[in-house]
Amino acid sequence: MGRVFALLLCLIGVAAPAAAQGRTDAADPVTALLTRLEQLLVRGERDQFATLFDPSAAEAGIRRYETDLFLTGATKALVRERERAPLEGVPPGDGFRLVVEFFVATPGHARILTAGIDVRRPPNGNLASWRIVMLEGISSVDGLYRLRLETDRPLVAKNFRLTSEDLTVVLDEGTVFPVQTDDGVTGVVLVGRGEMQFQPAPPAERGQLRIFSGRETLNAQFETAFIRLNPSDYRAQVGALNLPAAPIDARAVRRAESVFERLAPKSFLVDLRDLSSDEWFLLPPNKDFVAEVDTRRYDTLTFTRSSAQAEDVSLFQRENKKTIALYASAAKLAARGRFYSDDAFRDYDVQDFNVDVSVQPERQVLQGRTRLALRVRSTSMSSVTLRLADALQVQSVVSVEYGPLLHLRVRGQDTVLVSLPRAVPQDSDLTLIVTYGGRLSSQDLDIDTIAVAGEPGQDSQTLFPVEPHYLLSNRTYWYPQNPVWDFATATIRVTVPDGYRAVASGEQVPPSQVIAPREGLTLQNGATFVFRSAQPLRYLALVVSRMSRVSEKTMTIESSRPGADIDKVTVAVEAQPRLQGRGRQLAPQVEEIMRFYSTLVGEAPFPTMTIALVESELPGGHSPGYFAVLNDPVPTANASWRGDPASFDGYPEFFLAHELAHQWWGQALGWKNYHEQWLSEGFAQYFAALYAQKARGDRVFGDMLKQFRRWSLSQSDQGPVHLGYRLGHIKTDLRVYRAVVYNKGAAVLHMLRRLLGDEAFFAGLRRFYDDRRFQKAGTDDLERALEAESGRTLDRFFERWIYGTDIPRIGFKSTIRDGQVTVRFTQPNDNVFDLPVTVTLTMADGKTRDVIVPLTEAEVEQVIPTETAVRRVQVNQDGAAIAEFEGS
């Protein structure tokens, strides 16, 4: 399972499955046989292993499995029967196919294995004559170690240093306590006077560090620290220093033990639960590094270098759960380049989901069974990593190809590790059926939605309670899925109590048309809703509430995309009881917006679109594929959201327009990694503005542009658009994220449109959408599409506006003469921005005329002919340029 455990860098722990309900009756001959095997393992009696096998068993196979199962010096062994089924070809009761789990440990290291074992009683044999006929498909979790803090052999430290990418941990004076394993020293506890020095290389990360600490370099004093690294890296960094032994100081020992007990379990811990009460750890891979530093000023800071990650360097504050820095090391950047996709770190593709869930919304409880059709991407795959909420207990994982499979839970990481009996080669298909259930909280609206918070210090007091709804979506991990999301078709079967309805990703179809994975899940008094998606989806979602369908209409869509297969879209509205009238009023707006966006992009992405209208204390929404949850605010006291980047006066349809735009931007077209979130949110924001112009006129559109500019100017120093969800994260101010990713992203698109012209701009967007439809996209893909349609090079444009934080300061001067106005713009030669600027001429009669001047060089001068006298010249009165202007 080598590659899988590279993912465990800072995991809280891995939990083994609960003990299987196998037979434990001592009189049971199979149990007796397994007990005998367990005794041989713990005693190390390798020479007796073959006596457990039927004479027909191949000797070579016996010796191979003997090597796998026996550990020299073993002090503990457990053999657990997990599954039992009748063995084909023998009389009933005379043979069984078993799935067995092994745990074998020495005082210092351990191994977990799972195997299929065929056992049978020979003809005319007695109960004691049962033997193993075949043992196959052993898969293992190896390399588990006990950590030993060497308090009896401390070392003297003076200017002791350990380094990793952009990090130096210096113990000026104190004591080093090695952390030992059977494979060598894998860490140290530092006690004394020290300093943590961190200086990230990327400018954007230095900016985030400045927000966190006030400086672009972190120098944090500490008295204790815990560091993990690979034994070979320890030997390379420390082995030649020949540190002298330190006298044993009882106080230093107590501090070291306290640090070790508190911080060691934070990373690489494997919690085996019923298999072992001891703590078992993995070794960090070569060059990986974890430093847990108890700083005086910032509490515990965690630095990690994790080679398995696309961005392998991070600095994290555990206490407040803040990511301070996250970026690619120089070596990683050189290997993968600036642009990357999370897909590069995906071992498999999910081709199709078949999800069957029973939901009890009042208790927030679900029972689920999901079938995943997988295709292997990596050269070979010996384990499958699934994402599933920690709150949901996995009852079984079964492969159609291999039967029941060993699975381990990664606690605190919403992860399940599934061990395969053999390595599966690239391009192979694999089908898993996962059964699970538990209590799972409804998803709150978060930074990927448009809900806005109230003003600081003002509490929302609802005059009457809202009708509840139960939302399961991309952040609840309510069904087993790939940790790196990918597009897949899906079928969702939802059973809810009487009186409730469900809306989910997909086109609703009669339940009789769908076959659930194994037997369907039901409620005693309930209704079943089925949704099927022939179009691949980024993720699956559902919402359950007391709703009624108040509107449904099928409309024709004129498509300009060659080969488009959707010419009709069914638009429906589901509304809670108090919102049914509002829902009927909403339906025509949904149709109009869908038609408008389809005209701009060239097609509709999905054949159905359902709005689930729900009560909430604040406006907002969430838009998975095929449907959107739209909040309708109830009367409140002391609630205000007007100071938010996403609050637009005079445009009540904004939230609806924004969420509907996500069906194209964010769902049909996804993003390659979190840096590219603006391709979803910035595009949805701009398309909502375009609809505002159509529905509400130029004044509302102009007000939105000015608000885009105002928030861009005030928050751009918090980080570039390309920083994605991390904007505002350190200070817990989500307005920063919305100001930069939403509003500045939309403003950038508007500047591009004015720079390239409408024809090239919208043709470029359609090309971009067509090329990346039902795929992930990056800014580089957008740039190529726009360059292809416009014939212009846009490297500098995107470098300045998406990857940079600077706001251009532009000198402006105008000269009025008879019959003409000369305008002159200047920028620094070393930091030229490409942007179109509106020059407004006010004539003597009070009329105005707007002229767009494209700025693409350090100095731009343009002569504007005039037919009447000009009284005044103004610049950027429409707020369309994100810039500061000086002069007149």
Segments predicted by a language model, with ranges:
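Bacterial N-terminal signal peptides
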Residues: 5-14
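Short solvent-exposed beta->alpha transition segments
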Residues: 22-39, 43-108, 780, 784, ...
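Exposed beta-sheet edge and beta->alpha loop/turn motif
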Residues: 87-144
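A surface-exposed beta-strand-loop module
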Residues: 143-148, 152-155, 159-252, 308, ...
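Extended, low-hydrophobicity, Ser/Thr/Pro/Gly-biased non-transmembrane segments
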Residues: 223, 228, 233-347, 435-550
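Non-catalytic accessory/interaction domains
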Residues: 285-287, 294-334, 339-345, 469-472, ...
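Hydrophobic helix-coil surface modules that form long, contiguous segments used
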Residues: 335-337, 343-369, 375-380, 388-391, ...
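Hydrophobic alpha-helical and helix-loop surface patches within well-folded domains
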Residues: 416, 531, 561, 570-828
